[in-house]
Amino acid sequence: MSERSVGIVATNYHTIEGEFQLEGGHTLKNIRLAYETYGNLNKEKSNAILVCHALTGDAHAAGRHSDDDKKPGWWDDIIGPGKALDTDRYFVLCSNVLGGCKGTTGPASLDPDTGRQYGITFPVITIRDMVNVQKRLIDHMGITTLFAVVGGSMGGMQTLQWCVAYPELVKKAVVIASTAVSSPQQIAFNEVGRNAIISDPDWNGGDYYEGEPPVNGLSTARMIAHITYLSDASMHEKFGRRLQQGESYKFDMSNDFQVGSYLKYQGDTFTGRFDANSYLYATKAVDYFDLSMNGSLAEGLKYVQAKMLVISITSDWLYSPYHSKKIVEGLTVKEHDVSYREIESSYGHDAFLLESGQINYVIHNFLTHTSVADVMTEKVATIREGASIDTAAKVMFEEALTHLPVVNENGCLVGIVTSWDISKAVALKCSKLENIMTRDVLTAFPDEPIVAAAKRMERHSISALPVVDEKNRLIGIIDSEDINRLIG
């Protein structure tokens, strides 16, 4: 399939009415959430993928808002028809985080109690607060299962938090260039950036919205952070020790080197699109992020149910491969389904935004390698062997079933009854279940590819397969609708 753009898109808004409880104990009223969607939600609402943005990102992840836009959304290379997050197949959703400044309630928003911007009176938030707000949006859309949650950097933290806070909702998760526990070094860089903002006289205790914003402090904070997004190799390649002007030093305090001019440009342009107070709150949320429990990351991740893909960047020194491997170790201890990939790149941390070829390849392979467990229905109505046909018919009618597995007292599969079997029993005046049920039942295993199960169903002209574990205990069922929805 050729890769195309999602085209012209619009930002949508949802208001969470009433008071919203935050992890720190405070509440916020009537939170407004900015979000964008790409692709179509299927009838079963089972194809949704939530994309979580990084520290200074926003909801505009793909497409353009108008034909005049110079740049598309920040992950346009990954989201769209034929791309890893294929909008011909998935319903992709991205929202601006709580505390942000791109449409979602944050420090620059009006406090309904005062009619003025919150400023520094905005309550301190956490990654979990961000995720809880996203959950309310998912609920509003009627989505009860996320096919995947995907995010890089701070977006990876949100992805992990989703898997921990709402394990039953997330089928798959992709964590890119991130960590499960913010390190002292990462906290230190954030602290220096916050101090640069707070030290700017124009910050004015966070109350600057009717005056001059603290552009110098915010620009410096961005310059500091941007260094951590690059690698030594990429800076050597891009700038080396090349001078900004001429071939000799100026021997004054002006900027001599190209790398300095580049950082200043990054800082200055950043002040035109981001709020200084939002930067304070977002970095604080990152500092607080720690999914370990009693010092053990394995304990903190023990309830994760999603199939996980953890991706690191070889040259990333902000969230180095070490941090990704610690996530994998924490998941492996409890035997969670996790795979790990390293992206070879000299771009540093920003490679998750720049290495679109590798990122597309790895994510596409992970999302499309669908197993039976990814799509099976886990809550299956059953009937015990020895039950009457009348009982079976009643269960099938009340649950609107065409297939009813028969199990023994240990939950092991011993047969299956279909709606055709019930019709046959009525015609032949049978009363015993064992006279009509199929005993030699074709089954599937949870870890086998869905394609293999689909071929088995087609070969035998059946429309459902019970899913069993290694001891033949029933753990789920898949039917032709599940197959058609996924592989057409």
Swiss-Prot record:
Protein's pathway: Amino-acid biosynthesis; L-methionine biosynthesis via de novo pathway; O-acetyl-L-homoserine from L-homoserine: step 1/1
Domain (AB hydrolase-1): residue spans on this chain: 47-355
Gene: metXA
Catalytic activity, as annotated: L-homoserine + acetyl-CoA = O-acetyl-L-homoserine + CoA
Oligomeric form and interacting partners: Homodimer.
UniProt-listed GO biological process terms: homoserine metabolic process; methionine biosynthetic process
Similarity-based family: Belongs to the AB hydrolase superfamily. MetX family.
Gene Ontology terms, MF aspect: homoserine O-acetyltransferase activity
Active-site residues annotated for this sequence: S153, D316, H349
SMART domains for this protein: CBS
Binding residues annotated for substrate, in chain numbering: R222, D350
Function in brief: Transfers an acetyl group from acetyl-CoA to L-homoserine, forming acetyl-L-homoserine.
Alphabetized UniProt keyword annotations: Acyltransferase, Amino-acid biosynthesis, CBS domain, Cytoplasm, Methionine biosynthesis, Repeat, Transferase
Domain called CBS: residue spans: 376-433, 437-488
Species: Methanococcoides burtonii (strain DSM 6242 / NBRC 107633 / OCM 468 / ACE-M)
Location within or outside the cell: Cytoplasm
Entry EC no(s): 2.3.1.31
Lineage top rank: taxon: Archaea
GO cellular component, one term: cytoplasm
Protein name: Homoserine O-acetyltransferase
